[in-house]
Each structure stands twice: as structure tokens, then as C-alpha cells.
């Protein structure tokens, strides 16, 4: 994991962080980590399958007949594990 050093942090900010950490029942360091994580990470990462499903829905989706056709064309054989020998 990476380490970050914050220099010249005003005393008022450090005090506010300590108070906020105490309110949440964690250390100041854990509070700062939580603030950074919630600020820079999206609340929920969009997964590829969900994104593709929403695009298909916006485009009008598939009829039951089209979905069944794709289901019949799909390769249903189980994947073989890779051999490194």
C-alpha cells in the first residue's frame, strides 16, 4: 500500500479531523483514509454486464425470439482449463 504525507496541515483542520474520527469511533488515520476513499472512488462501479444491458435496453432490447436465437447460437461447451505443461 502507498503512504501519503500531508505537510502544513492547519491545526484547525487536524482538530476537526480528530473530532470527526472520534464521532465515527475510529482513529484519525482511519478517518482520513475513509474521507479519501469516498471522495475519489465512485459510490458504485458500473460493471460491464450492467452497462451493456442498459445500452441494449435503451436501444429497444431484444424480442423473445431474438433472445432465443442468440441462446441457441451460444457455445455451451464447458471451458477447458489451461495447461502449462
Swiss-Prot record:
Q: What's the source species for this entry? A: Sinorhizobium fredii (strain NBRC 101917 / NGR234)
List the keywords (alphabetical).
Plasmid
Q: What does this protein do?
A: Involved in plasmid stability.
Task: Answer whether the UniProt record assigns the keyword Transferase to this protein.
Answer: no
Q: Which family does it belong to?
A: To P.syringae pv tomato plasmid stability protein StbC.
Q: Which Pfam families match?
A: FitA-like_RHH (PF22513)
What name does this protein carry? Putative plasmid stability protein y4jJ
Q: Write down the SUPFAM superfamilies for this protein, in alphabetical order.
A: Ribbon-helix-helix
Amino acid at each position: 500500500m502507498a503512504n501519503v504525507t500531508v505537510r502544513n496541515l492547519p491545526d484547525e483542520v487536524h482538530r476537526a479531523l480528530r473530532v470527526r474520527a472520534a464521532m465515527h469511533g475510529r482513529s484519525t488515520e482511519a478517518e482520513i483514509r475513509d474521507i479519501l476513499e469516498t471522495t475519489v472512488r465512485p459510490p458504485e462501479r458500473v460493471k460491464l454486464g450492467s452497462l451493456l444491458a442498459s445500452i441494449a435496453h435503451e436501444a429497444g432490447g431484444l424480442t423473445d425470439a431474438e433472445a432465443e436465437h442468440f441462446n441457441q447460437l451460444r457455445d455451451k461447451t464447458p471451458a477447458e482449463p489451461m495447461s502449462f505443461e
